[in-house]
Amino acid sequence: MSGFLPFSRPAMGVEELAAVKEVLESGWITTGPKNQALEQAFCQLTGNQHAIAVSSATAGMHITLMALEIGKGDEVITPSLTWVSTLNMISLLGATPVMVDVDRDTLMVTPEAIEAAITPRTKAIIPVHYAGAPADIDAIRAIGERYGIAVIEDAAHAVGTYYKGRHIGAKGTAIFSFHAIKNITCAEGGLIVTDNENLARQLRMLKFHGLGVDAYDRHTWGRAPQAEVLTPGYKYNLTDINAAIALTQLVKLEHLNTRRREIAQQYQQALAALPFQPLSLPAWPHVHAWHLFIIRVDEQRCGISRDALMEALKERGIGTGLHFRAAHTQKYYRERFPTLSLPNTEWNSERICSLPLFPDMTTADADRVITALQQLAGQ
């Protein structure tokens, strides 16, 4: 048997090593010029006006919710089929996450489900661009505008995703992730884009102790050695070491996503003859970033359960992922919302499995996964 094929592996090369070396030798290794360059690059990529680099997408979500003054008594609409950090940040601020169902086959939250969940207490809507495909953000944003509710796009899966000809985050507010498995990575990191100047100003303060400027700003422009606290804030800034890696990865984005697309197409062709069900593609015009390739494993249809399939693939030296176990089925949220029923979310949460997908995979690697799936399907 070949060596273990992981579910994901970052595509790092000599360029990233050189970028880190440059920062280490520069004498300025924390937040500085590489952060500024990364923010400018994301404004250029998305077409949005402001970009704020942070230590993680979770940190970005936290301070965005804070800047919108979301707290006790407020409600925030979000799918349950998302990473739990979104629910956690809402809860930690004292607000109530209002979890809604998703489309059964795209796993996208729908405008209809969002609008049905709105109450006088609704303060924000957080749609997820899932697995690298875009949600119907025009329709969702129109709901937000009609009711005067903020829309925060969870774009953690969407670096390189386009919706109706525009990159995700082209307008409004969106949060990207540079976590180790994402389409571009710097190990840990995130970035917020927004067209709201006041929100951008608040986010810059909240990410760095509530100060009006960061350490590099003060050092470079000769400002007062101790800036004044304008509001209580956090330590969510990104180091230039991380930013330099992210910048280098961003240069490679088209190549990295092209390779992801090729592997996804290889899977799609093979799955046409297998009982495992891939996700449907959104009906609206889009470019898929293929952050994840997900199949649904229905035991009656496939002759094997999802958990048994994942274990069998592991025994064959193939890693898989689960994105995600529905938040409302996990202990804290299950006990907090014991009567919540989301049929499409629950059906998928019990069946979804993420296959290996990363740019350094070879055609032979994908063939190995396909052969294993064929064997497990009895073919």
Curated annotation (Swiss-Prot):
Its EC number is 2.6.1.87. One of its GO terms (biological process) is response to antibiotic. Pfam families: DegT_DnrJ_EryC1. The modification N6-(pyridoxal phosphate)lysine is found at K182. CDD domains: AHBA_syn. GO terms for molecular function: pyridoxal phosphate binding; UDP-4-amino-4-deoxy-L-arabinose aminotransferase. Its cofactor is pyridoxal 5'-phosphate. The keyword Transferase applies. GO terms for cellular component: membrane. Keywords: Aminotransferase, Antibiotic resistance, Lipid A biosynthesis, Lipid biosynthesis, Lipid metabolism, Lipopolysaccharide biosynthesis, Pyridoxal phosphate, Transferase. The keyword Transferase applies. It catalyses: UDP-4-amino-4-deoxy-beta-L-arabinose + 2-oxoglutarate = UDP-beta-L-threo-pentopyranos-4-ulose + L-glutamate. Signal peptide: none annotated. Homodimer. Catalyzes the conversion of UDP-4-keto-arabinose (UDP-Ara4O) to UDP-4-amino-4-deoxy-L-arabinose (UDP-L-Ara4N). The modified arabinose is attached to lipid A and is required for resistance to polymyxin and cationic antimicrobial peptides. NCBIfam families: PRK11658.1. This is UDP-4-amino-4-deoxy-L-arabinose--oxoglutarate aminotransferase. It comes from Escherichia coli O1:K1 / APEC. The gene is arnB.
